Amino acid sequence: ASNGGATTSKVTARSLDEIKKSGVLKVAVFSDKAPFGYIDKDGKNAGYDIVFAERLAKDLGVKVKYTSVDPAARVDVLTSNKVDITLANFTVTDERKEKVDFAKPYMKVALGVVSPENAEITDVSQLKGKTLIIAKGTTAESYFEKNEPDVKLQKYDQYADAYNALLDGRGDAFSTDN
C-alpha cells in the first residue's frame, strides 16, 4: 500500500496563496502512532510525518498548526476544511480517492500482525476464529473485513487504546502498518 498526503477535492481547499497569506499550514497528524506521529515526552508533536510537515511549512514560508486526528476522521477533517493536509499514515484507497486528492505517496507500508510471545501468530490463517485488534478507519480494518471474514475484529478509535488492548490481553493479536 502507498501512503500519500491528501487534500480535499469535493469542497474547495485553501489555495497555496491563501495558505501563504494566512501564515499557517493546518496539518492533521496522529498523536499516538510512533514513529509516524506522536506526542513526545515534552508534550510536542514528533515523528516522521511531523518532520515532513515542518519541511512543507518551511518551503511555503509559514508555520504549522497541528490537529490530532483519529484514523477514521482523516477524510472528515479534510472535507470539512479543518485542515489543509493530512499526514497521518494515510493509505491511498479507491474509496478515499472519491473524497480527497492525494499527493504522490511518500512511503510504502504493509500490514503486520503483532501477538504475544506465548501465542505467536506467524500466518494469517492462524487468526481464524481469533480476535484481532485494529484501529477504526485503517487499511487493516478494510483488509480484514474484506478478505478474512472468519477473524473477529475488535475496533478502537485510537492507536494507543488498541495497543493497550493487546497488552491487557483483550484480543489475540493486533494489526497495523509495519
Regions found by a protein language model. Give the residues of each.
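Extracytoplasmic small-molecule ligand-binding "clamshell" domains
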Residues: K10-N89
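Short, well-ordered beta-strand segments
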Residues: K26-F30, V114, T131-I133, F174
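Ligand-binding cleft/hinge of the Venus flytrap
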Residues: D40-K41, A53-V62, A140-D157
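Hydrophobic residues within well-ordered alpha-helices
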Residues: L56, L78-T79, L127, A165-L167
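Short helix-initiation/N-cap motifs at beta->coil->alpha
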Residues: K65-D76, A119, Q154-N164, D168
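A ligand-binding cleft/hinge motif common to bilobed small-molecule-binding domains
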Residues: D76, F90-E98, E145-K146, A160, ...
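Ligand-binding "clamshell"
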Residues: D94-P105, V109, P149-D150
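Flexible hinge/capping segments at coil-to-helix
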Residues: S115-L132
